[in-house]
UniProtKB/Swiss-Prot annotation:
The protein's name: Spike glycoprotein
Keywords on record: Coiled coil, Glycoprotein, Host membrane, Host-virus interaction, Membrane, Signal, Transmembrane, Transmembrane helix, Viral attachment to host cell, Viral envelope protein, Virion, Virulence, Virus entry into host cell
Keyword DNA-binding: no
Fusion peptide: annotated span: 1022-1043
Gene (UniProt): S
Subcellular localization, as worded in the UniProt entry: Virion membrane; Host endoplasmic reticulum-Golgi intermediate compartment membrane
Length: 1449
């Protein structure tokens, strides 16, 4: 059965001067008290079953509840002050529609304020709204203003129903409320609660507006409407959740103490976040942290919390194993109990005589040790008489001892003045107020006797286990705990903050638990040696009964070469084992008895001065030489041999080591002798490796690469990248077990993560890709257009909450790319027109580069310092906020620069389209009338048709095969003689003479004759000579004719050449002048090109410097990983592999200090560079405005010359400007006049030039002229160019340096100021020496290109000199050809030609007559033929049929 017991507390109401109520009712809530019970039941619903706890908070109280009734008015409101919380309720008794009125609650704060606005729509799902925004909220509203438009950057903008389940029938059963704190706001609405964490300042002032209570009466009384309950202090209620029933009752005694000390354990063993941790201390084995935050492993995971109401006179026993958890408050865990914490709650009064007389510790082996304290020095006989450990404040010093059988084994020290907490671990550590008071062997159970105590005190017993948590400590006590048990909490731990602001955070490396061991060694024949070391301890008691280890304890080494003092390893492998014995003696140093009870001891070998631990020798440590010795002679270092007792460790002997570093000898866990390859590989999983002596943790994967040289391969920082298995030559890669990622956190929740590998992380399963990284998110990228492809900002329509560089993340986890601001309108030129350049000016294009932004850098500090080593990460937390400061400095700098760059850059879509190569190749961007022309890259290719081969169907050339088979002779021909000749001969040599050609009436033959023609004509000549005497000389006629024809060909060809020579000489002499003039222009062009290349080289040098500066810094930062900073190694894994944990921590601490120093230097350099870029960005903005968008009047600002126009283009990390300027090539020297002084009778006046851009000067002809200062254009001055001044006197003011501030108030002598600073700091001022290493990764190396440009510039300059000489030589070169004589010969036809013509005529005329008269069917010849046919005919043969083809098989 549920019950409620309440305490009536009367609290005053504080209100402002304006309280416009016609009637004010102040009374209890009456029969509506069940509202408070319902509220507390909902509030305590988060409590675990089996809970009994006192709740203390700014809860609603029974009274006062107020109701303000006034006439209808919209502009009246009630003001309440100094509130901590406010609750209100709507009374529904006898209410009608006229009674339903609105309410506007305003809680004022800075910069955020809260409003809760309620309408009259009681049955609506959105009848009210809550707003937590920046701004000044209105005190009253209108019926339709259900928005948060009054504010900006709202933390909460949520509409909710007035009544639960959107039903008016449920109204009046739920309280509405607001609580506000410095770091959070809690809102209770329609049965649901909202908690929003953020920092804010609250004034405690609340206004209640729109309470338009009606004046209508129901049953003769005014109807109660809105009731409200102001809360000014904390109220306490007790909630008991047993057997499935929750009972709420009033807390009447020790309420505040119960809230401060008793909590309900949450599921999973977690302590509630609102617990005060009263009297809970940070357990430490060394120094105590006073105040601060750190991530550490502490016993804060509660298996059971047992509240004990008061002490009883009885002995209680608490065991670590098998403890009964039947009285636990809240959740119960079955984990192993590591520490039992006794939390004590007392007043500040002296508590002597109240507490435990003695704590009994049952250690391993059955030995019971007792801890007790005394108020003065005591003797042996009084140790067990009046000892005690008082709980609370003591009235004097207490001296504490460890006792065994009533005998003091060890003096512990003085008890703290006030004992608040005692914690005892199962490993034998005894803590008082967090400090390790005593350590012994492991403990099984604890028991102590309790003295009579008061009933008004209570305490708690917490069975806890170790867990990693972020602990906030103030005045040595724990005040807040954040468990590192989730992804977002891990980020909180790495950032050392319980509340994460919106932003990107590096994901801390997860701890690598137990992993397999991978070993890679060279295959060889191994021999193995087992080294057994026997240590015999001698123990005896002191005069006070304490155990003492005798220095007569002996160490026995194996015998080697009859020597038992030195033992050297002579095999390839060895394993070392230690055997310990213990004997005790009385007073005679004769150790014969077994060690029992407190004399029981175990031999341990500590690190001593060696750079490796004894217990790590079998962990694959390698040496070239290794010897153990009992003598210090020749030793390199020593181990300390100690006897470990229940009280302490006592060093008895030293074991010396002689060693040399190398790989010949290796320590192994077990015998592996013989021919073996002892390599053990665990692929594709996280493994602890030792590869050829290099240790670490990573993932080993097989690759397909082939490398001929090397066994293992490392990075610049010394990290192992891969290795080769010499047996099969396979190359394996070694990568970290996890990689760094950047998590996007919004409102304390991880919504996305940026990573370099495509693998799920942080519980995020949805992903997309970008050109540079993978992005995992809570946003469901299920669209095929976005999943697995580069996401575009248009794919997701949301407003980014956090930004970094050009990316942003929305609240829903979606990733968007932030483009620069877009401008509207088309691209238009600034101006158009023709520019006339004077002859004494030349145009130069000068290149200038200005850096606009830097590439943002994010460094995972813990990854850089510790490389994922878990132990190193714990040590790193001791440096408090070092990593957080470094990471935040880089993140804030990047965000600031991103905002400035975004606000600076604007982009036009059309300009971007024209700047694209693909769009520029498209003819659509050009004039439509030219679209039919071919276009590539913006260059018209119509002219290429004249130089490309055409498709001709007539073959006018021989093939390549024909060129190989025939000899090709090229000669000069006459017109079409050669072509006609070839066509006539058809390739037959005998037709040579027949196909002779005629050119201008002269018979010619081609001048070249092949071998066949020469043979033919030679035979003709020889025959003619031989037969000449016999009358056969006519045979040689063809030879003579052919020779003469070819001679004619040569003569005519010579004539043509003579004409061509005349034409060539005339044209060449005419071209010499043009060539000379052209070379002069080329000379000038090359000179300007040389200067242009020089400016381009300078600009590229700046680009290279900007791009590589950050790379050099990162390279230098990477190189620092090679430094060991006086540690034994730069590898953290190697240090922990060689040393015991305590010694290794000291060396790793040196690495942490050194690497943090390197990181700080890098951050300082980065921030300094960002400051420089910020100034450079402003300069670029000024140059765009003045040089690109307009024409600068400043000489030298937009290029070194008179500015014409400038173009800007993108460049790596900045902008590159192309300035077109006028550079003077000739100068005119004039004497400038400041003005003219004129005399007019007795009056003197002056004239000065009105336009300061003009210069007045007097020319050689004694006339005055005006000319612009930018270009020499003298003109005669006019009266309108001058302004008259009163006189011609020039006044000078003589002043000393001390008088300048009175004349020029803002004058500062910079030189003197700097000189004073240098004088003040010169004694302690030295110049730092900075060294830089060469960066060999992602390095923009333009040195070769710049050198090449400079070389070309110099070469072009030299070319101009050479061209000047060549121009002079060309001017001296004129063609004077010797003319060939032209002989004109008139050739007449010879007599035999005429004779032949006559014979032809005489012969042809009779023949023609005969053919016409005698032929035909009626002619003489026809008749004669018919007669002869009949007489001379022969017998005709028969016609045969054609023979067919016959196939014979």
């Amino acid at each position: 059965m549920k019950k409620l017991f309440v305490v009536l507390v009367v609290m005053p109401l504080i209100y402002g001067d304006n309280f416009p109520c016609s009637k004010l009712t102040n009374r209890t809530i009456g029969n509506h008290w069940n509202l408070i019970e319902t509220f507390l039941l909902n509030y305590s619903s988060r409590l675990s079953p089996n809970s009994d706890v006192v709740l203390g908070d700014y809860f609603p109280t029974v009274q006062p509840w107020f109701n303000c009734i006034h006439n209808n008015s919209n502009d009246l409101y009630v003001t309440l002050e100094n509130l901590k919380a406010l609750y209100w309720d709507y009374a529904t008794e006898n209410s009608t529609w006229n009674h339903k009125q609105r309410l506007n609650v305003v809680v004022n704060g800075y910069p955020y304020s809260i409003t809760v606005t309620t309408t009259r729509n009681f049955n609506s799902a959105e009848g009210a709204i809550i707003c937590i925004c920046k701004g000044s909220p209105p005190t009253t509203t209108t019926e339709s203003s259900l928005t948060c438009n009054w504010g900006s950057e709202c933390r909460l903008n949520h509409k909710f129903p007035i009544c639960p389940s959107n039903s008016e029938a449920n109204c009046g059963n739920m309280l509405y409320g607001l609580q506000w704190f410095a770091d959070a706001v809690v809102a209770y609405l329609h049965g649901a609660s909202y908690r929003i964490s953020f920092e804010n300042q609250w004034s405690g002032t609340v206004t209640l507006g729109d309470m338009r209570a009606t004046t209508l009466e129901t049953a003769g009384t005014l109807v109660d409407l809105w009731w409200f309950n102001p809360v000014y202090d904390v109220s306490y209620y007790r909630v008991n959740n047993k057997n499935g029933t929750t009972v709420v009752s009033n807390c009447t005694d020790q309420c505040a103490s119960y809230v401060a000390n008793v909590f309900t354990t949450q599921p999973g063993g977690f302590i509630p976040s609102d617990f005060s941790f009263n009297n809970w201390f940070l357990l430490t084995n060394s120094s105590t942290l006073v105040s601060g935050k750190l991530v550490t492993k502490q016993p804060l995971l509660v298996n059971c919390l047992w509240p004990v109401p008061s002490f009883e006179e009885a002995a209680s026993t608490f065991c670590f194993e098998g403890a009964g958890f039947d009285q636990c408050n809240g959740a119960v865990l079955n984990n192993t109990v590591d520490v039992i914490r006794f939390n004590l709650n007392f007043t500040t009064n002296v508590q002597s005589g109240k507490g435990a007389t003695v704590f009994s510790l049952n250690t391993t082996g059955g030995v019971t040790l007792e801890i007790s304290c005394y108020n003065d020095t005591v003797s042996d006989s009084s140790f067990s008489s009046y000892g005690e450990i008082p709980f609370g404040v003591t009235d004097g010093p207490r001296y504490c001892y460890v006792l065994y059988n009533g005998t003091a084994l060890k003096y512990l020290g003085t008890l703290p003045p006030s004992v608040k907490e005692i914690a005892i671990s199962k490993w034998g550590h005894f803590y008082i107020n967090g400090y390790n008071f005593f350590s012994t062997f492991p403990i099984d159970c604890i028991s102590f006797n309790l003295t009579t105590g008061d009933s008004d005190v209570f305490w708690t017993i917490a069975y806890t286990s170790y867990t990693e948590a972020l602990v906030q400590v103030e005045n040595t006590a724990i005040t807040k705990v954040t468990y590192c048990n989730s992804y977002v909490n891990n980020i909180k731990c790495s950032q050392l903050t319980a509340n994460l602001n919106n932003g990107f955070y590096p994901v801390s490396s997860s701890e690598v638990g137990f992993v397999n061991k991978s070993v890679v060694l060279l295959p060889t024949f191994y021999t193995h040696t087992i080294v057994n070391i026997t240590i015999g301890l001698g123990m005896k008691r002191s005069g006070y009964g304490q155990p003492i280890a005798s220095t007569l304890s002996n160490i026995t080494l194996p015998m080697q070469d009859n020597n038992i003092d030195v033992y050297c390893i002579r095999s390839d492998q060895f394993s070392v084992y230690v055997h310990s014995t213990c004997k005790s003696a009385l007073w005679d140093n004769v150790f014969k008895r077994n060690c029992t009870d407190v004399l029981d001891a175990t031999a341990v070998i500590k690190t001593g001065t060696c750079p490796f631990s004894f217990d790590k020798l079998n962990n694959y440590l390698t040496f070239n030489k290794f010897c153990l010795s009992l003598s210090p002679v020749g030793a390199n270092c020593k181990f300390d041999v100690a006897a470990r007792t229940r009280a302490n460790d006592q060093v008895v002997r030293s074991l010396y080591v002689i060693y040399e570093e190398g790989d010949n000898i290796v320590g192994v866990p077990s015998d592996n002798s013989g021919l073996h390859d002892l390599s053990v590989l665990h692929l594709d999983s996280c493994t602890d490796y030792n590869i050829y002596g290099r240790s670490g943790v990573g993932i080993i994967r097989q690759t397909n690469r082939t490398l001929l040289s090397g066994l293992y391969y490392t990075s610049l920082s010394g990290d192992l990248l891969g290795f080769k298995n010499v047996s099969d030559g396979v190359i394996y890669s070694v990568t970290p077990c996890d990689v760094s990622a950047q998590a996007a956190v919004i409102d304390g929740t991880i919504v996305g993560a940026i990573t370099s590998i495509n693998s799920e992380l942080l519980g995020l399963t949805h992903w997309t890709t970008t050109p540079n990284f993978y992005y995992y998110s809570i946003y469901n990228y299920t669209n095929d257009m976005t999943r697995g492809t580069a996401i575009d900002s248009n794919d997701v329509d949301c407003e980014p909450v956090i930004t970094y560089s050009n990316i942003g993340v929305c609240k829903n986890g979606a990733l968007v790319f932030i483009n620069v601001t877009h401008s509207d309108g088309d691209v238009q030129p600034i101006s158009t027109g023709n520019v006339t350049i004077p002859t004494n000016f030349t145009i130069s294009v000068q290149v200038e580069y200005i850096q606009v932004y830097t590439t943002p850098v994010s460094i995972d500090c813990s990854r850089y310092v510790c490389n994922g080593n878990p132990r190193c990460n714990k040590l790193l937390t001791q440096y408090v906020s070092a990593c957080q400061t470094i990471e935040q400095a880089l993140a804030v700098g990047a965000r600031l620069e991103n905002m400035e760059v975004d606000s600076m850059l604007f982009v036009s879509e059309n300009a971007l389209k024209l700047a694209s190569v693909e769009a520029f190749n498209s003819s659509e961007t050009l004039d439509p009338i030219y679209k039919e022309w071919p276009n590539i890259g913006g260059s018209w290719l119509e002219g290429l048709k004249y130089i490309l081969p055409s498709d001709n169907s007539k073959r006018k050339y021989r093939s390549a095969i024909e060129d190989l088979l025939f000899s090709k002779v090229v000669t000069s021909g006459l017109g079409t003689v050669d072509e006609d000749y070839k066509r006539c001969t058809g390739g037959y040599d005998i037709a040579d003479l027949v196909c002779a050609q005629y050119y201008n009436g002269i018979m010619v033959l081609p001048g070249v004759a092949n071998a066949d023609k020469m043979t033919m004509y030679t035979a003709s000549l020889a025959g003619g000579i031989t037969l000449g005497a016999l009358g056969g000389g006519a045979v040689a006629i063809p030879f003579a004719v052919a020779v003469q024809a070819r001679l004619n060909y040569v003569a005519l060809q010579t004539d043509v050449l003579n004409k061509n020579q005349q034409i060539l000489a005339s044209a060449f002499n005419q071209a010499i002048g043009n060539i000379t003039q052209s070379f002069g222009k080329v000379n000038d062009a090359i000179h300007q090109t040389s200067r242009g290349l020089a400016t381009v080289a300078k600009a590229l040098a700046k680009v290279q410097d900007v791009v590589n500066t950050q790379g050099q810094a990162l390279s230098h930062l990477t190189v620092q990983l090679q430094n060991n900073f006086q540690a034994i190694s730069s590898s953290i894994s190697d240090i922990y592999n060689r040393l015991d944990e305590l010694s290794a921590d000291a060396h790793v601490d040196r690495l942490i200090t050194g690497r943090l120093t390197a990181l700080n230097a890098f951050v300082s350099q980065t921030l300094t560079r960002q400051a420089e870029v910020r100034a450079s960005r402003q300069l670029a903005k000024d140059k765009v405005n003045e040089c690109v968008r307009s024409q600068s009047q400043r000489f030298g600002f937009c290029g070194n010359g008179t500015h014409l126009f400038s173009l800007a283009n993108a460049a790596p990390n900045g902008m590159i400007f192309f300035h077109a300027v006028l550079l003077p090539t000739a100068y005119e020297t004039v004497t400038a006049w400041a003005g003219i002084c004129a005399l007019d009778g007795d009056r003197t006046f002056g004239l000065v030039v009105k336009d300061v851009q003009l210069t007045l000067f007097r020319n050689l002809d004694d006339k005055f002229y005006l000319t612009p200062r930018t270009m020499y254009q003298p003109r005669v001055a006019t009266s309108s160019d001058f302004v008259q001044i009163e006189g011609c006197d020039v006044l000078f003011v003589n002043a000393t340096l001390s008088d300048l501030p009175s004349i020029i108030p803002d004058y500062i002598d910079i030189n003197q100021t700097v000189q004073d600073i240098l004088e003040n700091f010169r004694p302690n001022w030295t110049v730092p020496e900075l060294t830089f290493d060469i960066f060999n990764a992602t390095y923009l190396n333009l040195t070769g290109e710049i050198d090449d440009l400079e070389f070309r510039s110099e070469k072009l300059h030299n070319t101009t000199v050479e061209l000047a000489i060549l121009i002079d030589n060309i001017n001296n070169t004129l063609v004077n050809l010797e003319w060939l004589n032209r002989i004109e010969t008139y050739v007449k036809w010879p007599w035999y030609v005429w004779l032949l013509i006559g014979l032809v005529v005489i012969f042809c005329i009779p023949l023609l007559l005969f053919c016409c008269c005698s032929t035909g069917c009626c002619g003489c010849i026809g008749c004669l033929g018919s007669c002869c046919h009949s007489i001379c005919s022969r017998r005709q043969f028969e016609n045969y049929e054609p023979i067919e083809k016959v196939h014979i098989h």
